[in-house]
Amino acid sequence: MTASRIESIREGARKNFSRGYNCAECVLQAVLEHVETGLPRESLRMATGFGGGVGLFGDTCGAISGAVLAVGAVYGRSELPQDEDRKAAMQAAARQLYGRPGLYRIFNQIPNRMKEKYGHTLCREITSQWQDQWLCRDHALHCREIISDAAELAATLIFAEQEKISSEPFGANVENLKDLPAQCDAKG
């Protein structure tokens, strides 16, 4: 059952690209069509600016950004942990993100796995051979494959057991974190 839902999301993203959605929109729309998130259809608007690595800037691949938005639609926070003690509330919020389990461990897998497959996470690098022919067919086919892979990855993470995937080790990250920073630990 789950495998067929993942495949439906992958194929939905491919079809979305053929219909004219940009890379980020393709991934998010495919997930919104197949997963109950409670978000209105208008939520897709948030993805538009991420196309072409943020408005054709060439930064983080729009398909990767779309996958992050899609996974966030399911696992993202809608409220912060509450505690009358401000320090305890901050520590609880940090544990929710950095801890084991922690939400950043889920999101961190997206760019790391895509980089493993494509060698980069930047749109301008992943599509470098088409910089002078942005609208050519080969470029579109390449991006469609990236979009499909990003949608499949997002769906795989969404349908995985949350406790397990939120306890995975961090991949590459800005602080080379492996575990919760000591300053975020309630004891630290």
How would you label these PLM feature ranges?
Residues 19-23, 59, 142, 146:
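Short, contiguous, pocket-lining structural segments
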Residues 29-34, 68-71, 84-181:
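Amphipathic alpha-helical interface segments
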Residues 1-4, 28-49, 120-127:
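Acidic-glycine-rich active-site phosphate/pyrophosphate-binding loop
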Residues 5-11, 45-53, 131-132:
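Glycine/charged-rich beta-loop-alpha catalytic/anionic-binding loops adjacent to active sites
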Residues 1-19:
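Polybasic, low-complexity association/targeting segments
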Residues 65, 75-82:
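C-terminal catalytic subdomain
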Residues 21, 50-70:
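Glycine/serine-rich anion-binding loops at beta->alpha junctions
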Residues 182-188:
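Long, low-complexity, intrinsically disordered segments
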